[in-house]
């Protein structure tokens, strides 16, 4: 049973890469995501996605090499456009209708400009909307972009698919085998404990707009469906 009707999925760009095969985009993973979205949409759930660009570009390391932060962030925005177009193609191959909407001005042959009314129309028609370009401004993360878009389209929940991490812990589980996993936690507790889930702007915005957050391991089989149905190890963050 899925209790949400409109969701936003936050996918990290880094999670798309297949380092073993030396691929920037793992299309096998894209196909697995697409097959899950088909099932979810058939159940009446409206799906939007915000994708990062970390598989192509890491802005923090760029700054260390003399590239100004604002320019590095714009390069990162272009990286999200590439990921969004790749997702769109993978989804369409699976029989889904998908749109890419960009928060930065880009040739309309490549992607549409983001217009809220159009987004809602597409979602109501059962199409997947992929948001690219982050917030369109430097100094903001794609986590903040995800929360911003979720608030604008009135999504009830953000699904944050992590790479081999199945939720929120009190410390890094990859470094501390005794890290404590939270099945449920509030945004205020995250802020108080200074847990690295989303940046402070995104966390506060999600809390203030009463948007739930589900953090789960994207790489598990049928993870998106199971996360929505509560049948996978995850963390639910609420106000």
Curated annotation (Swiss-Prot):
Any coiled-coil regions, as ranges: none
Q: Gene Ontology cellular component?
A: cytoplasm
For the keyword ATP-binding, the answer is yes
Name the pathway it acts in.
Answer: Pyrimidine metabolism; CTP biosynthesis via de novo pathway; UDP from UMP (UMPK route): step 1/1
How is the quaternary structure described? Homohexamer.
Name the protein family: Belongs to the UMP kinase family.
According to the UniProt entry, its GO molecular function terms are: ATP binding; UMP kinase activity
Source organism per entry reads Mycoplasmopsis synoviae (strain 53) (Mycoplasma synoviae)
| UniProt protein name | Uridylate kinase
Binding positions for ATP? 10-13, 54, 58, 163, 169, 172
Q: Which gene encodes it?
A: pyrH
Q: Does the keyword ATP-binding apply?
A: yes
């Amino acid at each position: 049973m899925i209790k949400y009707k409109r969701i936003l999925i936050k996918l990290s760009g880094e999670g798309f890469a297949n380092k073993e095969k030396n691929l920037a985009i793992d299309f096998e993973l894209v196909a697995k995501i697409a097959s899950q979205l088909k099932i979810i949409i058939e159940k009446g759930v409206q799906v939007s996605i915000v994708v990062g660009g970390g598989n192509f570009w890491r802005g923090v390391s760029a700054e260390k090499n003399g590239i100004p932060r604002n320019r590095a962030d714009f390069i990162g925005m272009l990286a999200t456009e590439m990921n969004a177009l790749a997702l769109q193609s993978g989804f369409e191959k699976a029989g889904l209708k998908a749109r890419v909407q960009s928060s930065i001005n880009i040739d309309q042959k490549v992607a549409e400009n983001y217009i809220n009314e159009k987004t809602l129309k597409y979602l109501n028609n059962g199409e997947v909307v992929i948001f690219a370009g982050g917030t369109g401004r430097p100094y903001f993360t794609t986590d903040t972009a995800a929360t911003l878009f979720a608030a604008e389209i009135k999504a009830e929940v953000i699904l944050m698919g992590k790479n081999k991490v199945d939720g929120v812990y009190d410390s890094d589980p990859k470094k501390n085998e005794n890290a404590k996993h939270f099945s449920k936690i509030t945004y205020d507790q995250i802020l108080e404990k200074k847990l690295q889930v989303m940046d402070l702007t995104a966390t506060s915005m999600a809390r203030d707009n009463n948007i739930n957050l589900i953090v789960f391991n994207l790489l598990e089989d049928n993870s998106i469906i199971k996360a929505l149905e509560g049948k996978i190890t995850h963390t639910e963050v609420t106000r």
